């Protein structure tokens, strides 16, 4: 992946490349993400941003998965995320009512959209800070986080997600249309195929592999018919980071749209369970 972020920003912002420093961000599976730092800070008022900033985050979305270039991946994912960042920004004119949760829970953050270059497939958003760590890494770090910090963050996250699901439950077709949100159904289908194909590879040689993978396919199709809501869809531990102020930051809204309450809670719960077992604090008899 050799997209030239420096040249792109230099042309867009009309500043010399020497004022831009690019730092690759780790963890991206489907997109390439970088932090661009500016000396001096760059003026973004022409994009509706109220102030100059020392840094921004950019995401480039090629028509394939960045970590597996041989796997095609619809670039509509970036259009979905760009629209989601507007809908979830409580200061946006197009904000959804549920965006008020970011005001109600000020310790829960999400990036704000600065600019979306549809032709170049580049998304520019606010930087939530360089001193961030994913929630799974934060929970197992040494020395461990203070119990009161863990309790506060867990409470804020649980209440925020619970209220988000309730506030967006059973979204109507009319509402989804009014959101002007690209449909995430195609991406979900691609994701299901990717999971099933990987499962077949992992289970090669296992008896009844076709029966097992068919059950996974059926479950992926059927569960979305129940408990519908709006959601991140891809809600897991790597999409939740903790910054230096111990705020929760929710990242990667590229699947945002019609979802399922059980999926939203179950996927995240599964990853927290894996974190729990990785701590080696339970015995096989417990």
Predicted regions and their residues:
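Short, flexible/disordered intra-domain loops and linkers
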Residues: 65-77, 140-145, 278-285
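Active-site acidic catalytic loop and adjacent metal/ATP-binding pocket
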Residues: 29-48, 56-57, 216-264
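Conserved NTP-binding catalytic cores of kinases and kinase-like/nucleotidyltransferase enzymes
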Residues: 1-121, 243-248
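Active-site catalytic-loop/activation-segment of kinase and kinase-like phosphoryl-transfer enzymes
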Residues: 159-221
């Amino acid at each position: 992946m050799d997209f030239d972020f420096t040249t792109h920003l230099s042309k867009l912002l009309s500043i010399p490349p020497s004022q831009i420093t690019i730092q690759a961000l780790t963890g991206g599976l489907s997109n390439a993400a970088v932090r661009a730092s500016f000396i001096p800070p760059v003026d973004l008022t022409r994009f509706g941003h109220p102030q100059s900033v020392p840094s921004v985050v950019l995401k480039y979305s090629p028509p394939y998965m960045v970590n597996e270039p041989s796997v095609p991946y619809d670039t509509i994912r970036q259009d979905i995320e760009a629209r989601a960042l507007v809908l979830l920004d409580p200061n946006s004119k197009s904000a959804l009512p549920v965006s008020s949760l970011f005001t109600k829970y000020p310790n829960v953050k999400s990036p704000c959209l600065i600019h979306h270059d549809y032709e170049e497939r580049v998304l520019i958003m606010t930087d939530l800070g360089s001193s961030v760590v994913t929630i799974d890494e934060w929970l197992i770090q040494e020395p461990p986080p203070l119990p009161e910090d863990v309790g506060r963050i867990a409470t804020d996250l649980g209440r925020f997600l619970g209220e988000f699901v309730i506030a967006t439950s059973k979204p109507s077709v009319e509402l989804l249309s009014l959101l002007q949100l690209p449909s995430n159904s195609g991406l979900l289908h691609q994701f299901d195929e990717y999971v099933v194909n990987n499962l077949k590879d992992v289970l090669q040689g296992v008896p009844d592999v076709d029966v097992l993978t068919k059950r996974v396919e059926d479950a992926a199709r059927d569960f979305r018919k129940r408990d519908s809501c709006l959601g991140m869809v891809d809600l897991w531990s790597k999409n939740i980071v903790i910054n230096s102020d111990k705020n929760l930051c929710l990242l990667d809204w590229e699947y945002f749209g019609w979802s399922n309450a059980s999926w939203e809670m179950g996927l995240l719960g599964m990853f927290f369970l894996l974190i729990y077992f990785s701590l080696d604090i339970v015995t096989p008899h417990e």
